[in-house]
Amino acid sequence: MESGKMASPKSMPKDAQMMAQILKDMGITEYEPRVINQMLEFAFRYVTTILDDAKIYSSHAKKATVDADDVRLAIQCRADQSFTSPPPRDFLLDIARQRNQTPLPLIKPYSGPRLPPDRYCLTAPNYRLKSLQKKASASAGRITVPRLSVGSVTSRPSTPTLGTPTPPAMSVSTKVGTPVSLTGQRFTVQMPTSQSPAVKASIPATSAVQNVLINPSLIGSKNILITTNMVSSQNTANEASNALKRKHDDDDDDDDDDDDYDNL
């Protein structure tokens, strides 16, 4: 550290000379030159704060000017806040003795981390699980059936051949709407029938349509009675084949008669 004699007393300001004299009276003879500036800044800040507090106390007491009592009160309040000394040793020993008289919580006897009880730790969960059980609705016994709307059914007649017949092409468009009850409703579903197996004659086949009548019954809320009225085209195909066979038989009989006539 450098000595305070480096700066000439005549070249220093009056406030700096006063601060150097205070340090000399306190027995501080060796210090850096910037210590003077720091002490001056601290003194200026402390004096202005004390005067501001004294002015506030004077205005609160409804005084015209700031007197010495206001300054003493401001210094006392500021000293209690800024310049606090540590408590005496006897006071600290008394507090420590009272604190040590409280026994520590018991350690858990079982294995695991040797921690105090849960109420003294921060390891317990701080949340609760909420169950998501849904209440049964009052309309659980009601059964609803979706509305079924069937569009037009189209089928193209195909010419039968001697081989395996080709099934007719068809397209059915269905739409499912909102769930409704079938009680008191009646509707008809048209279903195309499968074509009869191999037909030996080349007869134009007509596509027959089966009519399925669905009529909800009032027997029970969960029972639906379905009555069907189906017209099959197999009978027509069988009749056509039988007529063709009879025609062939008649032709054979005519040929036999001609042969007998020639023999005669």
Curated annotation (Swiss-Prot):
Residues 154-164 have a biased composition (Low complexity). It is found in: Nucleus. One of its GO terms (molecular function) is transcription coactivator activity. Residues 151-176, 234-264 are annotated as: Disordered. Keywords: Acetylation, Nucleus, Phosphoprotein, Transcription, Transcription regulation. One of its GO terms (cellular component) is pre-snoRNP complex. Residues 250-264 have a biased composition (Acidic residues). The TFIID basal transcription factor complex plays a major role in the initiation of RNA polymerase II (Pol II)-dependent transcription. TFIID recognizes and binds promoters with or without a TATA box via its subunit TBP, a TATA-box-binding protein, and promotes assembly of the pre-initiation complex (PIC). The TFIID complex consists of TBP and TBP-associated factors (TAFs), including TAF1, TAF2, TAF3, TAF4, TAF5, TAF6, TAF7, TAF8, TAF9, TAF10, TAF11, TAF12 and TAF13. This is Transcription initiation factor TFIID subunit 9. The gene is TAF9.
